Amino acid sequence: MKKDKKYQIEAIKNKDKTLFIVYATDIYSPSEFFSKIESDLKKKKSKGDVFFDLIIPNGGKKDRYVYTSFNGEKFSSYTLNKVTKTDEYNDLSELSASFFKKNFDKINVNLLSKATSFALKKGIPI
């Protein structure tokens, strides 16, 4: 992943469907890049739920995960819904912890507290 890329997409196969996580890696929200993200997802030739991890642009856990669906061509809605289920949040947090630990040197942590930055660097789910 290039340092100047504002987001990274991870595709996870879950039984018969695909789950996508779009990690914001800079202070910009991925919603600013919806058309580019749609184009990137279309290249993956799959459809599924798309979760956005906004810990970097939000500066913390508040409203960290939001989601929509992708039908293989475009987002089903440009209105993002908050993840409110605890189990779903915890599962996403585990996946995110692994991603940020592996890619810590490529993210912008300027908006994060030292504690949050440390947790991401060490791969601790938060």
UniProtKB/Swiss-Prot annotation:
InterPro entries: RnlB/LsoB_antitoxin
Keyword Cytoplasm: no
Keywords: Plasmid, Toxin-antitoxin system
Domain of life: Bacteria
One Pfam family here: RnlB_antitoxin
Keyword Disulfide bond: no
Function: Antitoxin component of a type II toxin-antitoxin (TA) system. A labile antitoxin (half-life of 5.9 minutes) that inhibits the endonuclease activity of cognate toxin LsoA but not that of non-cognate toxin RnlA.
Subunit (UniProt): Can form a complex with cognate toxin LsoA.
More about this protein: This plasmid is only found in Sakai-derived strains of E.coli O157.
Name of protein: Antitoxin LsoB
Originating organism: Escherichia coli O157:H7
